[in-house]
């Protein structure tokens, strides 16, 4: 599911510029699998399957794989189009230190939505 995340983010000059002050790792949970996404100055430098429970990011965003599949469709259904819309419906959870997420909210929302096909 994350096959093209790194390439899409790093190829988007406007997105990288917006995240130029972001250097951290966060956990992206897709179903039963957790991935550590490492960002250096707005560019994704690595995405790795978390193999130890002690490895974590600054914050985590988790949802079922079917939720992410819908989120990444070209035109997601209502409540699936945005991570903030998924939270009150119980479709996603966010934990950890939320300060860097909130300070760079549009950047992270765009990073997470970047696997979405743009063609409708």
What role is predicted for each listed range?
Residues 1-120:
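Feature captures hydrophobic
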């Amino acid at each position: 599911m994350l096959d093209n995340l790194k390439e899409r983010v790093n190829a988007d000059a406007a997105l990288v510029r917006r995240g130029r002050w972001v250097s951290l790792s966060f956990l992206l949970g897709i179903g039963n699998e957790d991935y550590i996404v490492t960002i250096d100055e707005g560019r994704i430098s690595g995405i790795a399957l978390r193999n130890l429970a002690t490895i974590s990011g600054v914050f985590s965003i988790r949802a079922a794989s079917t939720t992410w599949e819908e989120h990444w469709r070209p035109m997601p259904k209502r409540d699936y189009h945005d991570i903030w819309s998924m939270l009150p419906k119980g479709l996603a959870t966010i934990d950890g230190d939320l300060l860097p997420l909130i300070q760079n909210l549009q950047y992270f929302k765009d990073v997470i939505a970047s696997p979405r096909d743009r063609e409708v």
